[in-house]
C-alpha cells in the first residue's frame, strides 16, 4: 500500500496545484495512472516467464544443430525447470490478466531475447546454474535475487516501458515493488499466485472524500 499512497499523494499535489480544482479530472488521472502501473506490474511478472521460454528455445535450438556439441545434447536444464517460474507460467490468474490487458511478450520477441541474452551473463545466473541445490525455496530465492538485482535494471527494459507510456517513466520502482511482494508471498503449496488487489485500492483512492484517500 505504501507505493499506492505515494501515487495518491502525487495526484493530490497535482490537484492542489490546479487552479480549476477539477476533482473529476483528478479522479480520472489517478485511476489512469494506477491502471497503467498495474499493467506494468503484469508486464514484469510475465517477463519472468518469457525468460524461461527463451531458455527453452535456446536448448531446443542447440539440440537441433546439424553438429550439436556435448553441451547441446546434454544441456543444463535447471533454469527451464525452475519450479517457481513454472508456477507463474501455469498461472491462470496471470495468464487471464495478461490477456485482458493485452500484455504479450511474444509481440516483443526480439527485445525480450536481447534482455535474456544480457541476463544470462550475470554472475547470479551462472552461480545458480552451477549450484547442485534444487527445490522450490532455492528456485524462489534465486528468482527474487535475480529480479531485484538484474531484471528490473536492464536498460532495454527501461526504454521499452518509456516507449509504452510516459506515465511509466517514474513508476518502475513502484511496479517492481509490487512484483517483488507478489513473488515473496507465493509458497510451494499455492495452486496459483495472488495478484495484489490494486482495483480495491483504486476504488478507495478515487473517492471524492479527502479522508478516504488516506488508506
Feature locations, PLM:
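Class I Rossmann-like S-adenosyl-L-methionine
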Residues: 1-215
